[in-house]
Swiss-Prot record:
Gene3D superfamilies: 3.30.530.20. The gene is MLP31. Belongs to the MLP family. InterPro entries: Bet_v_I/MLP (IPR000916), MLP-like_ligand-binding (IPR051761), START-like_dom_sf (IPR023393). GO terms for biological process: defense response. It comes from the Eukaryota. SUPFAM superfamilies: Bet v1-like (SSF55961). This is MLP-like protein 31. SMART domains: Bet_v_1. CDD domains: Bet_v1-like. It comes from Arabidopsis thaliana (Mouse-ear cress).
Amino acid sequence: MATKMAGAAMNLAKRESSSLCGKLETDIEIKASAGKFHHMFAGRPHHVSKATPGKIQGCELHEGDWGKVGSIVFWNYVHDGEAKVAKERIEAVEPEKNLITFRVIEGDLLKEYKSFVITIQVTPKRGGPGSVVHWHVEYEKIDDKVAHPETFLDFCVEVSKEIDEHLLNEE
């Protein structure tokens, strides 16, 4: 696996930042197919809580349709030991690339960040089974006292591993 524990995610992550704006990204190798993993976020994000009950408690559709650009999704999750919420607008969906992009428009993340955009892209592994999940987070901090969202990226790695395990158990 590309990462062994959540903390190891930062060893693979690239961070670019200039003052308040930044980008974090990491790759996680999974055993599930790229299409199935992508479909968990694009087609049935309300099932993510079944795969990761200790991290994501729920996902509700507030506007639009699952997996459609412009739709609004509301998440209940636990990050850094605290219950949190996020309302996100789907900004891009490219099924042929197994890509989806969410922009946070309300919630706990916006207490520290002016903007927060999450892109998930899953690609099949070359020459073998499994896939690679690429998480890309772009953000603008409210001020320079706010930390880069490295623990959020760790959270994404853990969620990816639990979804992978869930998808493999569904087969």
